[in-house]
Structure formats: C-alpha cells, structure tokens
Amino acid sequence: GLVGTLLGHIGKAILS
C-alpha cells in the first residue's frame, strides 16, 4: 500500500 511504500523509502534512506 501507500503507507508501506512510504515507510520503505524512509527505511531505505536511514539504512543508506
């Protein structure tokens, strides 16, 4: 869903 994608992008940014 939209929220899942948003969290995925945020998590990826933190992980980078």
Curated annotation (Swiss-Prot):
Keyword Magnesium: no
GO biological process: defense response to bacterium; innate immune response
Residues recorded as bearing Serine amide in the entry: 16
Alphabetically ordered keywords of this record: Amidation, Amphibian defense peptide, Antibiotic, Antimicrobial, Immunity, Innate immunity
Keyword Secreted: no
UniProt family annotation: Belongs to the frog skin active peptide (FSAP) family. Frenatin subfamily.
Role noted for this protein: Antimicrobial peptide with potent activity against Gram-negative bacteria. In vitro, is cytotoxic to non-small cell lung adenocarcinoma A549 cells. Also, stimulates production of some pro-inflammatory cytokines (IL-1beta, and IL-23, but not TNF-alpha) by mouse peritoneal macrophages and down-regulates production of the anti-inflammatory cytokine IL-10 by lipopolysaccharide (LPS)-stimulated cells. Very weakly stimulates insulin release. Has a very weak activity in hemolysis.
Protein name: Frenatin 2.2S
Organism from which the protein derives: Sphaenorhynchus lacteus
